[in-house]
Amino acid sequence: MNHAPHLYFAWQQLVEKSQLMLRLATEEQWDELIASEMAYVNAVQEIAHLTEEVDPSTTMQEQLRPMLRLILDNESKVKQLLQIRMDELAKLVGQSSVQKSVLSAYGDQGGFVLAPQDNLF
């Protein structure tokens, strides 16, 4: 059985999944991006399995090379966008920790509210 057409089709599907993931990351649809990740991983595993069964010809390798480049470029862009998002989340977590520390430090004032007085003289 000739698996070469199936291998080529599997690569096309991987390109589509890669483009979807890049679009989701660009649009900051993080939940959807995470949900689509498993389908992407499965597609990569299918290609690995098919590649074991098929020894792609030089011609087929030349046809697949641009797809591989596109997939790698998309993956790099997704990683960059994810890093930006992780930095944003780290900043928010840091701000939350500071707020918690401030509330903890000033919340233990024995029930007294510290406020400036209007007439100091």
Swiss-Prot record:
Gene that encodes the chain: fliT
Any one annotated GO CC term: cytosol
Protein name from the UniProt record: Flagellar protein FliT
Organism superkingdom: Bacteria
Keyword annotations: Bacterial flagellum biogenesis, Chaperone, Cytoplasm, Repressor, Transcription, Transcription regulation
A Pfam family per the record: FliT
Subcellular location: Cytoplasm, Cytosol
Subunit: Homodimer. Interacts with FliD and FlhC.
Residues covered by region (Required for homodimerization): 1-50
InterPro entries, per database record: FliT
Family as reported in the entry's similarity comment: Belongs to the FliT family.
Record keyword NAD present: no
Region called FliD binding, residue ranges: 60-98
One Gene Ontology term from the biological process aspect of the record: bacterial-type flagellum-dependent cell motility
Organism: Escherichia coli (strain K12)
Free-text function comment from the UniProt entry: Dual-function protein that regulates the transcription of class 2 flagellar operons and that also acts as an export chaperone for the filament-capping protein FliD. As a transcriptional regulator, acts as an anti-FlhDC factor; it directly binds FlhC, thus inhibiting the binding of the FlhC/FlhD complex to class 2 promoters, resulting in decreased expression of class 2 flagellar operons. As a chaperone, effects FliD transition to the membrane by preventing its premature polymerization, and by directing it to the export apparatus.
